Design a protein with these regions (language model features):
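A short, surface-exposed interaction/processing loop segment used at functional sites
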Residues: 56-58, 298-302
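Short, charged/polar low-complexity linear motifs in solvent-exposed/disordered segments
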Residues: 40-42, 84-86, 314-316
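Generic preference for hydrophobic/aromatic residues in regular secondary structure cores
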Residues: 12, 51-53, 58-59, 72-76, ...
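Short acidic, glycine/tyrosine-flanked loop/strand segments centered on an H-E-D-like triad
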Residues: 66-98
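Post-signal peptide N-terminal segment of secreted/secretory-pathway proteins
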Residues: 1-66, 98
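Extended, low-charge, aliphatic-rich alpha-helical segments
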Residues: 1, 92-300, 307-377
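Short charge-dense sequence patches
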Residues: 54-74, 79, 230-234
Length: 377
């Protein structure tokens, strides 16, 4: 019989893998044990010290997350504490047996530690990743596959310094990048390089023909912790409204000359009981710049609301345009200022904020790169 306590440290390290992004979870620790053996009236107390190193590999590719069984190496050293027997002869025999069997018992103790730690590590990692594994499958991969919107190319890889994710979203009649992306400063910690065609191509599959109601919009904004402007609030005294996204270009973005254009295109609008079956484009243009505290987006004028098939508007169409202009001017704020970088979520919160280092919005490309600003101790 005995009691064992483990003191250790968990660390993470990226692994070289050209086929999928891979990270090693590592545990380095020391197990201190106190053991008591009783036989033929003799009580032997021993102390054990086991150093252990365990690893478990986690990988991610387009199919989701996979893990390999945990592995471990351990080394145990046993020391004789005390022997209590009915006579000195009994105690001497017990000591001799301990010395002769020490190496075998140390090996057995090491194997016991390996079995225990690897089993526990497998269970803990599975519990930790359970929601992530299920969430990727049920909320991202499966819905996109059902709608035919899963990226044509979805590749991941990792080196000892970087994790890379490359996506290509395209169809037979969809657009693609016509120019090379801007040069990236590879010394930064996190980077995003996005071509405007990805947003258009992706939303055509995911949002084409989908209706967005006022209630759903408020639900989405609330989920992301955004403030609900008065023009978008729902409830008594508020007229309901909805937009049905177009099958082509439901949401598009443009990156030109340090400007970002965000556009929504609908094929049908509802304002209360009134239904407008006309294609309308709603667009906001932002001037974007890097500041000392992050990124600033300043809207260039009001949100534009245009009936695409009309040069002159009827009274009802003018009223609809006015309603949509008020609502989307409230949605697309006129000045968005980043302060102090991007705060990491959950258990990564204490790691520090991501501070913007590079910002390019030009020639169809958006590039953002960040460094992790570690908090002062």
């Amino acid at each position: 019989k005995g009691v064992a306590t483990l003191k250790g440290q968990v660390s993470y390290a990226l692994a070289e893998n050209s086929q999928r992004a891979t990270i090693n979870v590592m545990l380095d620790g020391t197990i201190l044990s106190k053991n008591v053996a009783k036989k033929s009236g003799v009580t032997v107390n021993t102390n054990g010290t086991t150093t252990i190193h365990a690893e478990k590999r986690i990988s991610f590719d387009k199919n989701g997350f996979t893990t390999s069984p945990a592995t471990a190496k351990a080394a145990t050293k046993l020391e004789l504490g005390s022997i209590d027997g009915p006579s000195s002869t009994h105690e001497s025999i017990a000591k001799t047996k301990f010395v002769k069997g020490r190496s075998v018992n140390e090996e057995a103790a090491s194997q016991l530690s390996v079995d225990s730690i690897t089993k526990e590590m497998d269970a803990n990692v599975l519990e930790l990743l359970g929601d992530v594994i299920d969430g990727y499958k049920t909320k991202i991969r499966d819905p996109l596959l059902r709608r035919g919107g899963f990226p044509e190319q979805f590749s991941t890889s990792s080196t000892k310094g970087f994790v890379n994710l490359q996506l290509l979203q395209t169809g037979r009649y969809q657009l693609a990048a016509s120019s090379e992306p801007p040069a990236l400063n590879k010394s930064t910690d996190v980077s995003l390089i996005l071509h405007e065609s990805l947003v258009r191509n992706f939303t055509e599959v995911v949002l084409g023909g989908v209706e967005l109601t006022d209630e759903k919009l408020v639900e989405h904004l609330t989920r992301f912790g955004a403030e609900i402007p008065d023009e978008l609030k729902i409830g008594p005294g508020k007229k309901s409204w909805a937009i049905t996204f177009s099958n082509t270009q439901p949401i598009s973005v443009g990156f030109r000359n340090n400007q970002i254009v965000i556009a929504i295109q609908g094929q049908q609008f509802r304002d209360g009981m009134r239904l407008i079956k006309e294609p309308i484009r709603i667009a906001a243009t932002y001037n974007v710049e890097k500041t000392e505290t992050g990124m600033r987006l300043q809207r260039d004028g009001d949100v534009a609301v245009d009936f695409l098939a009309r040069k002159t508007l009827t009274v009802i169409q003018v009223a609809t345009k006015t309603v949509m202009s008020k609502k989307f001017n409230a949605l697309f704020k006129d000045d968005i200022v980043g302060q102090g970088g991007i705060k990491l979520p959950g258990q990564w919160e204490n790691a520090g904020n991501l501070i913007l280092q590079q910002l390019v919005a030009n020639n169809g490309w958006l590039m953002l790169s960040y460094n992790l600003d570690k908090p002062s101790k």
